A protein has these predicted regions:
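Binuclear metal-dependent phosphoesterase catalytic core
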Residues: 1-13, 117, 123, 133
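Acidic/histidine-rich, surface-exposed loop or edge segments in extracytoplasmic proteins
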Residues: 6-22, 73, 150-155
Length: 189
């Protein structure tokens, strides 16, 4: 069975179990890291922020061998990379929407969310968001359309849309690159 041999092919190894729970968890954050890094290849510089919705990451990743099938189970959708540009005031609203959802997969961001799902504090790359500054966000097309309770993600000033680069392909490439360098997967890029 060709499909079985393809899906069972080992492409890497994880040193740790990675879950997908709110408000924060390893696997969605790692996927957000991969999106953020991919923006560097596409746009010439790593995005300030990476965002993936918890619903886009469908299952956990167990410690041990990672197969092609595991990656398809984790990322079953054909979501494509989008690199979006926002003013800080809109990025602040996005962070407030994420807080109301009690967290999503994030990269480049530190945030404190209250038990009432209110944003108490946020930093991008270790600094407060400046309303007039311009920020880049690497995410997926589904979220760039303002879906999944984050309408402000659809209010970008500029965008680079890469339908040829799905989040699954990017994550697979990341896992294979790590394996080629004899680096097992940990919870952050």
């Amino acid at each position: 069975h060709q499909v079985d041999s393809t899906m069972n092919r080992v492409v890497g190894e994880s040193l740790v179990d990675m879950n997908r729970e709110r408000p924060e968890s390893e696997l969605p954050n790692l996927v957000a890291d991969v999106l953020r890094e991919a923006a560097g290849t596409v746009a010439g510089r790593k995005a300030d922020v990476g965002i993936i919705n918890m619903g886009g990451v469908r299952t956990t990743l167990a410690k041990g061998s990672i197969t092609v099938g595991n990656i398809y189970e984790i990322l079953p959708f054909e979501n494509a990379l989008c690199i979006l540009t926002f003013k800080g005031e809109v990025l602040q609203r996005i962070m407030e929407e994420i807080a109301r959802r009690n967290g999503e997969g994030m990269s480049g961001v530190r945030m404190v969310i209250s038990s009432k799902k209110e944003l108490k504090h946020v930093e991008v790359n270790g600094k407060p968001i400046r309303p007039e500054a311009t920020y880049t966000v690497a995410t997926v097309d589904y979220l760039a359309e303002g879906n999944d309770g984050m309408p402000s993600l659809g209010q970008f000033e500029d965008s680079i849309f890469r339908p040829d680069l799905t989040v699954r392909q990017l994550f697979m490439h990341y896992v294979e690159q790590c394996a080629a360098q004899h680096k097992p997967i940990t919870s952050r890029v």
